[in-house]
């Protein structure tokens, strides 16, 4: 019933969209007769009509899409089909276009990008990796330039490239920017650490199209982008605590829920820790560092698996994206967890650095005025797209009917039996000359099968999501006669597999999937590697009771599973009941995995709310400071009055010595100690006196400046220094707080409530500290000039 309702709703949406397609086609007939110059002139005309208010982007859409479509034919030799027009309309409306593999998402995106770039505001195409961003940019740039728009790649494609001053601004000063989610996120954070208006480079986040949108804003939604700062004061307990944790026994000393990534000490574990470390009360304030390290060691030891969550590679811990299987070099777990894993692996513990700035992809894309996305598997995530982002998913029809045959799962008792049968099937397929793509969950499994196939004299290409450009080329060749490719689930994603000559007659590409993934969307993406644009093909998933999905997520009765496992092999092969039972177990395990993924993203979203609100407020304040252009005539008296009232109210007893000390520490190094006229019992009199000292010091500082221009720079810098130093402390504190709250409490609601309560308290403390540091900085900072006459500010 639900499926029928979904189909009906989708058809109603398509019916409305097709009316716009008809108008595009009508305009298309007209613009075909235009000369090249006349067609190019339409871009200028569109901009003028938008600027004058004659048209909006919505009213321009049919004509603008027709122009972009015709230009695409003249420049690229590609004429967008009606299904691509449907996708392009969905994208402009700010929704999710589900378009199958090979349906031309890259070309589809050019029309909404062209339309939205006419506004002169920031327009972005965001994809998952540098290779895809560069490939699509280079392919489509000639179209935009022919139409009179500028386009750029939002980064320099050189490893470890160091950007020169102003270079980032030049990259972003274009109508359309192609980039990746990671690079855009880090650029946003860097942009908001700028110490001058000239140092900012990121244009408005107005409109964006996200390729592989489910991968970025669902699967990776809770991934934090982190800019690290100074090293933290580091514990030396990592290795010692690891040795203690090795002595603990599950269900005796500790309990864990692997599905929820939760682990905690039981009473016997607490007693063992107190005895081992000779502490009287493990949860006393004095032992909190020890408790934190024990919790980290437990999580590292039991909740993070080698070759599943991370690799040990060249002496480093390299994280793995569990959904995509792709390695994440340079990415580190926060709050000491990375160091705990290093200790687990017997490695030298690296330095844990404080967090300067952070944002999740979820909150990054919520900064856009409007964004949309493309994916082949949007419908399966529709409820989450709507709940988190208020986006609907429209299933765009394929240009040609899908001919791929998705075979029923092949069921086996053990992984060994499964592997033997799977290799047998691969050999049979390979002997016919049919290309085969074998997909595994892990790089370790891919390497194993690649070696086995080589031993059987079947040459193969191995793709384990390490070299994106090389793998894109290899995956593109996976449709040739006799081709054998072994890959992880993410390797080569975004590249179409085109069938070689004669392959269609053999039945197309055969996709063999070693096991169900933790998410049904990924399963569907993998099946979709075959059967592009109406090509023939097939897919089949092989399952067993030994599969990772079953072992990690199944909540079936263990005795029942063991009973199934021990059945006679002869009976198994003839048992439809067995097949159904195993399929039920696998499907249920996958559903639990997906539900836990949704809950984890919801939880991360809840935790992120505090820092997101605080970050927005702090960045707004920074921007206000950067906009100061007349500091000489600004009145900072109200700011100082707030700070001095804080001081007098925080002091239980005001004395002459305390006030003099405060002046030396915060206002002037040259105070003459003349306080005879001050009544220290009258708090308001003390505030008035401090204001007089503040204004004297401010006037002296202004006098020492060479010009109003330099004074303006001085004020901006000292205020930014106050904001940034306090904000960096707050960000790092919130990261530590989130980790500690999660460790202290298993009840999610309580953990979230506790986090937000403490986060709000700490934010209020931070805002007071910012004001205090602003006053201190503007009074006690010094400005000197170097040999070139440039100002150098020395902060107190």
Swiss-Prot record:
GO terms for molecular function: ATP binding; protein-exporting ATPase activity. The keyword Translocase applies. It is an enzyme of class 7 (translocase). PROSITE patterns: SECA_MOTOR_DEAD. Belongs to the SecA family. Part of the Sec protein translocase complex. Interacts with the SecYEG preprotein conducting channel. Has a central role in coupling the hydrolysis of ATP to the transfer of proteins into and across the cell membrane, serving as an ATP-driven molecular motor driving the stepwise translocation of polypeptide chains across the membrane. This is Protein translocase subunit SecA 2. It comes from Staphylococcus aureus (strain MSSA476). The lineage of its organism: Bacteria, Bacillati, Bacillota, Bacilli, Bacillales. The gene is secA2.
């Amino acid at each position: 019933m639900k499926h029928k309702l979904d189909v009906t709703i989708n058809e109603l949406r398509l019916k409305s969209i097709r009316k716009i397609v008809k108008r595009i086609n009508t305009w298309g007939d007209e613009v075909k007769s235009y000369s090249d110059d006349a067609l190019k002139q339409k871009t200028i005309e569109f901009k003028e009509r938008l600027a004058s208010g004659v048209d909006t982007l919505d009213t321009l859409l049919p004509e603008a899409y027709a122009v972009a479509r015709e230009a695409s034919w003249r420049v690229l030799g590609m004429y967008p089909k009606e299904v691509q027009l449907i996708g392009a309309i969905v994208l402009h409306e700010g929704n999710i276009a589900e378009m199958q593999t090979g349906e031309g998402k890259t070309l589809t995106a050019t029309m909404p990008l062209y339309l939205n770039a006419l506004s002169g505001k920031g327009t972005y195409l965001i994809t998952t990796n540098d290779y895809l961003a560069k490939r699509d940019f280079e392919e489509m740039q000639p179209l935009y330039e022919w139409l009179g728009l500028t386009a750029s790649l939002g980064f320099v494609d050189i490893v470890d490239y160091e950007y020169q001053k102003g270079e980032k601004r030049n990259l972003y000063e274009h109508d359309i920017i192609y980039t990746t989610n990671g690079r855009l996120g880090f650029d946003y954070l860097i942009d908001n650490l700028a110490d001058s208006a000239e140092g900012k480079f990121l244009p408005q986040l107005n409109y964006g199209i996200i390729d592989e949108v489910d991968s970025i804003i669902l699967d990776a939604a809770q991934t934090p982008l982190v800019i690290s700062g100074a090293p933290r004061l580091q514990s030396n307990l990592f290795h010692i605590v690891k040795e203690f944790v090795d002595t603990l026994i599950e269900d005796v000393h500790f309990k864990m829920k692997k599905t929820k990534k939760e682990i905690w000490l039981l009473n016997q574990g607490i007693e063992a820790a107190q005895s081992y470390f000779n502490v009287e009360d493990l949860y006393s304030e004095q032992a909190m560092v020890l408790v934190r390290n024990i919790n980290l060691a437990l999580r590292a030891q039991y909740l993070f698996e080698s070759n599943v969550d991370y690799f040990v590679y060249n002496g480093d811990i390299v994280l793995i994206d569990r959904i995509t299987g792709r390695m994440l070099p340079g990415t580190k777990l926060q709050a000491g967890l990375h160091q705990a894993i290093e200790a687990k692996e017997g490695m030298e513990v690296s330095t844990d650095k404080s967090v300067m700035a952070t944002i999740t992809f979820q909150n990054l894309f919520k900064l856009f005025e409007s964004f949309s996305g493309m994916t082949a598997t949007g419908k399966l995530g529709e409820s989450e797209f709507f709940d988190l982002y208020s986006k609907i998913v429209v299933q765009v029809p394929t240009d040609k009917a899908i001919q791929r045959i998705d075979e029923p799962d092949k069921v086996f008792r053990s992984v060994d039996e499964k592997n033997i049968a799977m290799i047998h099937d691969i050999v049979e397929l390979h002997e016919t000359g049919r290309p085969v793509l074998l997909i595994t969950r892990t790089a370790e499994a891919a390497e194993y099968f690649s070696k086995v196939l080589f031993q059987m004299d079947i040459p193969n290409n191995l793709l384990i999501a390490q070299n994106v450009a090389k793998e894109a080329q290899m995956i593109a060749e996976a449709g040739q006669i006799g081709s054998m490719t072994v890959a992880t689930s993410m390797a080569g994603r975004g590249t179409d597999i085109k069938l070689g000559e004669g392959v269609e007659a053999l039945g197309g590409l055969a996709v063999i999937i070693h096991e169900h993934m933790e998410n049904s969307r990924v399963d569907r993406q993998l099946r979709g590697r075959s059967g592009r644009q109406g090509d023939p093909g097939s897919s089949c998933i092989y399952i067993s009771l030994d599969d990772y999905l079953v072992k990690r997520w199944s909540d079936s009765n263990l005795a029942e599973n063991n009973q199934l496992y021990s059945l006679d092999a002869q009976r198994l092969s003839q048992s439809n009941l067995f097949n159904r039972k195993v399929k039920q177990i696998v499907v249920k395990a996958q559903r639990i995995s997906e539900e836990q993924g949704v809950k984890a993203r919801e939880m991360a979203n809840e935790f992120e709310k505090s820092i997101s609100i605080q970050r927005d407020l702090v960045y707004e304040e920074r921007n206000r400071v950067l906009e100061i252009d007349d500091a000489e005539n600004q009145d900072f008296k109200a700011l100082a009055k707030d700070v001095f009232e804080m001081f007098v109210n925080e002091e239980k007893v005001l004395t002459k010595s305390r006030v003099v000390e405060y002046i030396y520490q915060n206002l002037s190094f040259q105070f003459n100690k003349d306080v005879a006229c001050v009544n220290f019992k009258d708090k308001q009199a003390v505030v008035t006196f401090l204001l007089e000292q503040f204004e004297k010091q401010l006037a002296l500082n202004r006098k020492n400046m060479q010009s109003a221009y330099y004074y303006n720079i001085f004020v901006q810098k000292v205020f930014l220094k106050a904001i940034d130093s306090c904000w960096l402390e707050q960000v790092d504190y919130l990261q530590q707080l989130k980790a500690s709250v999660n460790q202290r409490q298993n009840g999610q609601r309580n953990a979230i409530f506790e986090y937000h309560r403490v986060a709000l308290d700490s934010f209020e403390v931070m805002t007071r500290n910012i004001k205090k540091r602003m006053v201190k900085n503007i009074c006690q900072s010094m400005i000197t000039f170097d040999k070139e006459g440039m100002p150098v500010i020395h902060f107190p």
